[in-house]
Amino acid sequence: MRKAVRRAAAALTAGVLIALGSSAPVLAQGAWEAPAAEKAKKNPAPADAATVAQGKKVAEVNCVSCHGAKGKGDGAAAVALNPKPADWTSKKVQSESDGEIFWKLSTGRGAMPSWKFLPENDRWALVRYIRTLAAK
């Protein structure tokens, strides 16, 4: 009898740990807020066609598989992701500061990788490109 109770308790404990472990990434998502100092950062990249073209190239090489060709979060890999990739054309993304977007793509979270290995000027150019996608 004791052996059966111990087995049941062990099975229940294992089940709870597995459930908590598999749901932890989802529970950890919550609001994704950049620190105030990061939100306040200004984009040093020029707001010109060359910078936007540079940012578009960065997106095509690194981001399209998840965010899609038009930045709507509908890339081929997005089907398997939860939460879904951000829609760069959305009011939510477009209302974020340049510093906040830069911080998010530099830091990453969950399925969103950190792009810190990309040169800083490429990441700022990507922010400039994302800005061109508003309401498209």
Predicted regions and their residues:
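Bacterial N-terminal signal peptides
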Residues: 11-21
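Electrostatic cytochrome c docking/interface patches
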Residues: 30-58
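Sequence/structural segment immediately N-terminal to covalent heme-attachment motifs in c-type
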Residues: 49-72, 78, 99-107
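Short glycine/proline- and charge-enriched loop/turn segments
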Residues: 36-42, 80-87
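Short sequence/structural segments immediately N-terminal
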Residues: 58, 133-136
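Bacterial N-terminal signal peptides that target proteins for export
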Residues: 2-12
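Extracytoplasmic electron-transfer domains, predominantly the class I c-type cytochrome c fold
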Residues: 82-134
